[in-house]
């Protein structure tokens, strides 16, 4: 249909549901050919009477039968209207939303950049902490090994010290036992010697009593009494000589 020419009034629509019996309109089934494309009819909306007049009305209005959705004269919204709507929306977005959108995109970019920087920093910090933990774990294992070696060495030293003390105690106890045994042996010998001497003296006295009479005892006493003055005189002379020599 050309603009400016009157569009004939369509005949009364006949229901198509009975003829097809498939539950859908022609052109909407999986095997039906696609419906025609409305490029520019009805930029404003639906008006069946105005659409039938042709001319500029065909540009502004399109036909659509509300009673019969399967009417072959029905026209979908024009493709040009979608293009115009999209262009108008793009113009509005560019005219009024370019700066806010640009700022939002810039802010979003800064936010993403900051988040990436934070993520990179957190990753580096995590790697550093991981290295620190690994170093601490390594040092901990080394420290445990050193402690085990130190404890083993200390145990050996303590063992040697205990054995040395036990040996010294054993030697000292043996020496003390030997000393006590020797002292007891000496005491026993002394007691035996004393007892033997006493027994010998008693035996000698008894023997002398048996062999020496009373006359012999009197003679010994007299000789002893006679020897006393001579001993006193000799002692006096030696004392005088000593005094003269000192003078």
Swiss-Prot record:
PANTHER family in the cross-refs: ATP SYNTHASE SUBUNIT B, CHLOROPLASTIC
Functional description taken from the UniProt entry: F(1)F(0) ATP synthase produces ATP from ADP in the presence of a proton or sodium gradient. F-type ATPases consist of two structural domains, F(1) containing the extramembraneous catalytic core and F(0) containing the membrane proton channel, linked together by a central stalk and a peripheral stalk. During catalysis, ATP synthesis in the catalytic domain of F(1) is coupled via a rotary mechanism of the central stalk subunits to proton translocation. Component of the F(0) channel, it forms part of the peripheral stalk, linking F(1) to F(0).
Keyword line: ATP synthesis, Cell inner membrane, Cell membrane, CF(0), Hydrogen ion transport, Ion transport, Membrane, Transmembrane, Transmembrane helix, Transport
Family membership noted in the UniProt record: Belongs to the ATPase B chain family.
InterPro entries: ATP_synth_b/b'su_bac/chlpt
Protein name per UniProt: ATP synthase subunit b
Bilayer topology annotation: Single-pass membrane protein
Cellular component, GO, one term: plasma membrane
Transmembrane residue ranges: 79-97
Record has Cell membrane as a keyword: yes
Highest taxon in the source lineage: Bacteria
GO molecular function: proton-transporting ATP synthase activity, rotational mechanism
Subcellular location: Cell inner membrane
Gene designation: atpF
Quaternary structure, from the entry: F-type ATPases have 2 components, F(1) - the catalytic core - and F(0) - the membrane proton channel. F(1) has five subunits: alpha(3), beta(3), gamma(1), delta(1), epsilon(1). F(0) has three main subunits: a(1), b(2) and c(10-14). The alpha and beta chains form an alternating ring which encloses part of the gamma chain. F(1) is attached to F(0) by a central stalk formed by the gamma and epsilon chains, while a peripheral stalk is formed by the delta and b chains.
Region (Disordered): 1-33
């Amino acid at each position: 249909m050309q603009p400016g020419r009157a569009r004939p009034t369509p005949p009364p629509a006949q229901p198509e549901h009975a003829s097809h019996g498939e539950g859908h309109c022609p052109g909407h089934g999986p095997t039906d050919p696609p419906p025609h494309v409305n490029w520019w009819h009805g930029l404003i909306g639906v008006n069946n009477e105005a659409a039938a007049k042709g001319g500029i009305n065909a540009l502004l209005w399109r036909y659509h039968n509300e009673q019969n959705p399967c009417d072959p004269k029905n026209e979908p919204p024009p493709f040009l209207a979608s293009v115009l709507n999209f262009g108008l929306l793009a113009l509005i977005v560019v005219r009024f939303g370019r700066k806010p959108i640009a700022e939002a995109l810039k802010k979003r970019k800064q936010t993403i950049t900051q988040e990436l920087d934070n993520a990179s920093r957190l990753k580096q910090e995590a790697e550093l902490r991981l290295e620190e933990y690994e170093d601490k774990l390594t040092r901990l294992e080394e420290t445990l090994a050193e402690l085990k070696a130190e404890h083993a060495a200390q145990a050996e030293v303590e063992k040697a010290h205990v054995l040395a003390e036990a040996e010294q105690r054993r030697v000292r106890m043996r020496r003390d036992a030997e000393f006590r045994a020797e002292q007891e042996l000496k005491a026993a010998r002394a007691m035996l010697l004393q007892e033997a001497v006493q027994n010998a003296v008693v035996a000698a006295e008894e023997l002398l009593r048996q062999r020496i009479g009373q006359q012999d005892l009197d003679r010994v006493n007299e000789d002893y009494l006679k020897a006393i003055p001579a001993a006193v005189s000799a002692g006096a002379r030696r004392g005088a000589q000593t005094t003269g020599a000192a003078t």
